[in-house]
UniProtKB/Swiss-Prot annotation:
The gene is SARS1. ATP binds at residues 302-304, 318-321, 391-394. Keywords: Acetylation, Aminoacyl-tRNA synthetase, ATP-binding, Cytoplasm, DNA-binding, Ligase, Nucleotide-binding, Nucleus, Phosphoprotein, Protein biosynthesis. It comes from Oryctolagus cuniculus (Rabbit). Belongs to the class-II aminoacyl-tRNA synthetase family. Type-1 seryl-tRNA synthetase subfamily. This is Serine--tRNA ligase, cytoplasmic.
Amino acid sequence: MVLDLDLFRVDKGGDPALIRETQEKRFKDPGLVDQLVKADSEWRRCRFRADNLNKLKNLCSKTIGEKMKKKEPVGDDESIPENVLNFDDVTADTLTNLKVSQIKKVRLLIDEAILKCDAERIKLEAERFESLREIGNLLHPSVPISNDEDADNKVERIWGDCTVRKKYSHVDLVVMVDGFEGEKGAVVAGSRGYFLKGVLVFLEQALIQYALRTLRNRGYTPIYTPFFMRKEVMQEVAQLSQFDEELYKVIGKGSEKSDDNSYDEKYLIATSEQPIAALHRDEWLRPEDLPIKYAGLSTCFRQEVGSHGRDTRGIFRVHQFEKIEQFVYSSPHDNKSWEMFEEMIATAEEFYQSLGIPYHIVNIVSGSLNHAASKKLDLEAWFPGSGAFRELVSCSNCTDYQARRLRIRYGQTKKMMDKVEFVHMLNATMCATTRTICAILENYQTEKGIIVPEKLKEFMPPGLQELIPFVKPAPIDQEPSKKQKKQHEGSKKKAAARDVTLENRLQNMEVTDA
């Protein structure tokens, strides 16, 4: 995932100042731009020198051939005149005045210079790439500039009643319908491990079927993706920080052959966006085939490093969940990708409106965007039991930022194009099932149970098409209130103090008696 290098090159029409400004607006290090420009300038000089050295080497070979054809003596003199040691000044006439043995010696020296130049070029290329991979995409003008997501995300619109309050949060409701095993899940899988069971399994499957059908009716091709990716491919779709904070690494044998002891390093996917982004890797996509729209279905795996203490109970924030994803390859021309961006968020809105989930759409501030996103809109549902908005959908236009590293090009082959162009790539959540279940539970709770949303009834089994009944008490009702806990703790402290006082008195009495 990278920007076009020509954007950093003034002689190619680029504007490093614009990228530096973008880095500042993202609250990232603008010095990376200067480091890249310096490394790129040196790299280009090095490549220019290597090209000239190769031309000179070819000229040496040509001159030797001509001299041999004329049957000139080879000679045994390998001394090199001073004027020849400066390769920049060597011409065909210079070489003509040398013996074949001398030209061969010059050619050997040129080979050494080329090797040295290539080593320097590779080093500079690595330095340039290290800076390039950490420089974010150019921002859309409508992105709010701030580093405070909580205070400055811009609310674009609201749908439904986002003021209503209800009694229970999803943490209690998943237990009340007997659809969740948290403690046992943690024993088996560790923190945030869980078993989804009973009615919530059917509700999850209903959401998956309804989301896939909705997207298929809008021209999306359903696609079930691999759950893990090779390291070299994941590096092309994920930014560096994700490897430490989000992705799980798995190691297995590199071959099915019993005598092969090599091991492969792979990564579990955090979203189906990652494998779908690589689906057309190294391809040319024809204009008449665009847009290509996929409805990705996958299990997603996330470490959630940095989320310690947040949403530790229930199924809202977990390490493993199912998700339906919108993913689109779009033309880079005529504002097509931005039109698609609006279409994708509208599709997500229609889905949640049809489920009767109130929400607002927020424009995410620049400092909270990942490197690839030029702009991101989130759909945050209203959770009446929790009294808060919670994110259900993220919709991003990454323009050509991802496609460039994956080499997914637009149009015909390079021979048919003046300049290579890259497709634009967009992604948007349709339905992360565990989070959507939480939203449904809170919004559709009654005294007796959870009303099944109208659109999901046909996907639910007989007996569960109208109401999911409560079969267990709410955990919060079983716990002592904070006031009761405080009073109980106070009573324990007073009792302990009385015991100490009584013991001291008894000891004093024993001393007096003695």
